Amino acid sequence: MNYKVKFEHVTKKYKLYNKPFDKLKDLFFRSKDGEYHYALNNISFEVPEGEIVGIVGLNGSGKSTLSNLIAGVTMPNKGTVDIKGSAALIAISSGLNGQLTGIENIELKGLMMGITKEKIKEIIPEIIDFADIGKFMYQPVKTYSSGMKSRLGFAISVHINPDILVIDEALSVGDQTFTKKCLDKMNEFKEQGKTIFFISHSLSQVKSFCTKALWLHYGQVKEYGDIKEIVDHYDEFLKKYNQMSVEERKDLRKEQISQFQHGLLQEDQTGRERKRKKGKKTSRKFKKKRVLITGVCIALLTGIISTGYYYKNLLPFNSENKYAEKVASKENVTESKQMVKKEKGAAKYIVNSNGISIREEADASSKRLAIANFGDIFTISDSNKNEKKDVEWIQITLSNGEIGWISTKFIEPFKSNNNIIEDAKLADVTALLKRVYGGNMVSAPTYFGKTLNELETTYPQPLNPLPSMTGKTIVKDGNIQFGISQDKVVEVVFQDISMSIAKLHELLGKESLSNDAEKNYFYETKSYYIAARSDQTHKEIQSISIVKK
């Protein structure tokens, strides 16, 4: 077969570190021991020239890693990747320098792809026309929205005329007009016989455009071949997956990881086996290092003690200092006891992840009452804790007074800290959203405290009722959602906003609490609690929840 792309037993893994120091230490003392995440594990496939392959799979299955391997952004740990021709990767802001303008990025990317300056000057007008972002082409890319970055990245990549085009979710943030323009361009490439890899969560786009499908499932190729057959199989799987609770999804992931030997492998056990195989030679090597380090430490300690012996007055060991030390110690104990009392009296807990089930009983199999998300705050009863099936549960009170149970893995004590930002910071956020989504974004927080009837009467647009959440009545208008509890507006949520994480931090500064794995951030102002939650790709902020204190 005359293939264009060929993967043979390819494995890509990443070492996990508990803290930055471990990573630094690994630079000097290379060690294969530790935990690894296997993004791709022993995958093989061939793609003939002219095929358009749709790559589907759940988040974390290795789709973006696969696209990076095809584009040459990263190299495999094992196996071979054979690419015939040049490949261009199109992802949101991929390869774009935020400090440079759009024009400067075109020149930079063209030069990196080996295009002459004369040729770059020829294609710049075509790229400007295709991207259609107006005067922003002459502004730094860091000021762009996700959609504008996607437009520029796509325009550059298709006009440098690559042999292989890799599109990683780049069409997910554009409007329908631009998406159609992109699909038309991709069809041109298809007619020219170019090979295209199309990564998307939109099964309709994959089915209508692609000629083959590759289903990645937790680092393995589950199916590869006929587009209709594989998309139908994946769609059936998604329907079942979407009906699962968060706990059931995590159980499925653990089961698949165990089956495919993928993800967080049990490196402790393999590490011990590896150490035994190294034998006495390695043991002697490390023993010499330990002896050397111990000797240096003893020498330093001896020098410090000798200095202290001859210069006693430099050391604060007189009786007065001892007395002061005792007084300070008593004060610290008293203060510590007071802090413990305060903590015991605390009645607020905060959810630290998204999509967490609140159960009727302290059991994962009991009826689900509601779904809680990162930043939701609940009151609890001190004594109402229960341990069942090795999982500790805590009883919480919903907004409507209903009692429910939530696993303590997903909730933690909420404490206000000194990192409280000004209310004006929220105004900066709504002012930015106003420019994109309209004036209602700015006025939305003014409806706090209004009854449902007052809200429906004074709000300029019709409000659509939605199913209740965590004990709140929900009504919505476009990107704005209101939460009503005890007939008062208590929450405003801006949805589908596609804000970059860098822009969020630029507007609000340092967060009070974060979930770095899911890219969720919690802020506290003098009057509000603000929870910024990322989308499923964890690449940008999808919603911002505002709750009045």
Swiss-Prot record:
Protein origin, superkingdom: Bacteria
Principal subcellular localisation of the protein: membrane
InterPro entries associated with the record: AAA+_ATPase (IPR003593), ABC_transporter-like_ATP-bd (IPR003439), ABC_transporter-like_CS (IPR017871), ABC_transpr_TagH-like (IPR015860), Bact_Polysacc_Export_ATP-bd (IPR050683), P-loop_NTPase (IPR027417), SH3-like_bac-type (IPR003646)
Keyword Lyase: no
Any one GO molecular-function label of the UniProt entry: ATP binding
Catalytic activity: ATP + H2O + teichoic acidSide 1 = ADP + phosphate + teichoic acidSide 2
Cysteine-cysteine disulfides: none
Enzyme Commission (EC) number: 7.5.2.4
Binding residues annotated for ATP, in chain numbering: G57, L58, N59, G60, S61, G62, K63, S64
Record SMART domains: AAA, SH3b
Keyword line: ATP-binding, Cell membrane, Membrane, Nucleotide-binding, Translocase, Transport
Region (Unknown): 244-549
Enzyme kind, highest EC tier: translocase
Domain SH3b, residue spans: 346-415
GO CC terms in record: plasma membrane
Subcellular location: Cell membrane
Membrane topology category: Peripheral membrane protein
Signal peptide per UniProt: none
Pfam families: ABC_tran, SH3_3
The UniProt record lists the keyword Cell inner membrane: no
Boundaries of every ABC transporter domain copy: 22-243
Protein task: Part of the ABC transporter complex TagGH involved in teichoic acids export. Responsible for energy coupling to the transport system.
SUBUNIT field: The complex is composed of two ATP-binding proteins (TagH) and two transmembrane proteins (TagG).
Family listed: Belongs to the ABC transporter superfamily. Teichoic acids exporter (TC 3.A.1.104.1) family.
Name the UniProt record assigns to this protein: Teichoic acids export ATP-binding protein TagH
Phylogenetic lineage: Bacteria, Bacillati, Bacillota, Bacilli, Bacillales
Encoding gene, per UniProt annotation: tagH
